[in-house]
From Swiss-Prot:
Pfam short name (any one): T6SS_HCP
Gene: yhhZ
Superkingdom of the source species: Bacteria
Family classification: Belongs to the hcp1 family.
Record protein name field: Uncharacterized protein YhhZ
Gene3D superfamilies, sorted: Hcp1-like
Length: 392
């Protein structure tokens, strides 16, 4: 069985059809936090063929829960309403977490068939078939895409949602304050905070206010991470790319870290008993074995002095270092060596720990939260390049 595909739909007449479809009122106990305004899609068929005379696009058929949108789709087919549709595909990444990796957008979409399936001992679902005039397919991780427009002369009549009737942030028009926030992220990403602030000032309006919302003495590092991810979406919608810098907080001071992966995770609070067992295993054997193995690598021998290497060979951490979980045990992190990094305490380990604590604050056991997450790259952090740069 495939992972759930999340669908957003906006109608030219009805506005946001998918709004509220992922809530408990719409789907009962199948509701999902973070996907309240999306439709849960279980299967999708996109039929394209070519007989030698050009490609033929036969529309898309998908299966979804019967939910809040069901009567609205009947309205759409009855009134021949033009729709704008977006399908977000998820998969399990190398960290064992869900990541958005594929996207299909349809414009000029019209419903051609609806079939309800109410069968004993099965989910109540409906299968919907749609035709379309424009399709965009993007692999968000591999950065490939395809688009097709059936009738180029009709492009301007294709319905495109605006900020008044579209709940999905992907299509909202940026106001000047939002532009300021993106400029702040650009300053972090490019290591030129003052230069980007100057640009915000020159734009006028509320741009500088938006900039200062992000980069001020009260800024939380996770807000910068979020803004940086938004920055990468400007040229490639919903692509989560590798970001090489992250602004964290330590004792009220901003710290710029390099060599960071920022990913989107679904943070799920782990039961305290399970957490205690994993922490006990880590303290008893895992940390020691990780350090012994790491001490045998050329990376460690080229970095630490003889005294620190001896400590590592005995399973002890070097002075001013700690072993850090990239994905925390409090969430879905494991004790696998791939999830561990030997990290310098000041300021690096404390910055990452502060970020994780901010995200986890207020989340109860079993609750979930979709959030950006900063991960130090490699097995030893910071990267050797950063150390060399700081000594120049």
């Amino acid at each position: 069985m495939s992972n759930i595909v999340y669908l957003t739909v906006t109608g030219e007449q009805q506005g946001s059809i998918s709004a509220g479809c992922g809530t408990s009122e719409s789907t009962g106990n199948r509701w999902q936090s973070g996907h309240e305004d999306e439709i849960f899609t279980f299967s999708l068929l996109n039929n394209i063929n070519n007989t030698g005379l050009g490609s033929q696009f036969h529309g898309i058929t998908f299966c979804k829960l019967i939910d809040k949108s069901t009567p609205l789709f009947i309205n759409s087919i009855n009134n021949n309403e033009q729709l704008f549709m977006g399908f977000d595909f998820y998969r399990i990444n190398r960290f064992g977490r869900l990541e958005k990796y594929y996207y299909i957008q349809l414009r000029g979409a019209f419903l051609s068939a609806i079939h309800h399936q109410i069968i004993e001992n099965q989910l109540d679902t409906e299968t919907i078939t749609i035709s379309y005039e424009f399709i965009l397919c993007q692999h968000l991780i591999a950065n490939t895409e395809f688009s097709y427009l059936a009738l180029p002369e009709n492009y301007n009549r294709l319905f495109l949602p605006n900020s008044k009737n579209q709940t999905n942030n992907r299509f909202k028009t940026l106001n000047s304050k939002a532009i300021g926030r993106l400029l702040a992220a650009g300053g972090v990403y490019n290591g030129n905070i003052e230069g980007f602030r100057d640009t915000a000032e020159k734009l006028g309006g509320d741009a500088i206010k938006g900039y200062d919302q992000i980069l001020n003495e009260k800024t939380a590092g996770i807000a910068i991470a979020t803004a940086s991810i938004l920055l990468t979406k400007r040229s490639n919608v919903d692509t989560y790319t590798e970001i090489n810098s992250y602004l964290g907080k330590l004792r009220g001071q901003q710290k710029l870290l390099d060599g960071i992966d920022i990913i989107e995770i679904i943070y799920i609070k782990r039961p305290s008993k399970d957490l205690a067992n994993l922490r006990k295993e880590f303290n008893k054997t895992v940390r020691k074995n990780f350090l012994i193995k790491l001490a045998k690598t050329s990376e460690a021998s080229g970095r630490f002095n003889a005294e620190d290497l001896l400590r590592m060979r005995k399973g002890n951490v070097p002075l001013n270092y700690n072993v850090h979980h990239k994905l925390s045990l409090d969430d879905g992190g494991t004790n696998d060596f791939e999830n561990l990094v030997l990290i310098e305490n000041e300021p690096y380990h404390k910055v990452f720990t502060n970020m994780q604590s901010r995200i986890a604050k207020g989340i109860l056991v079993g609750e979930s939260k979709i959030t950006p997450w900063a991960i130090p790259s490699g097995s030893i952090y910071p990267p050797m390049k950063n150390i060399m740069d700081h000594t120049k």
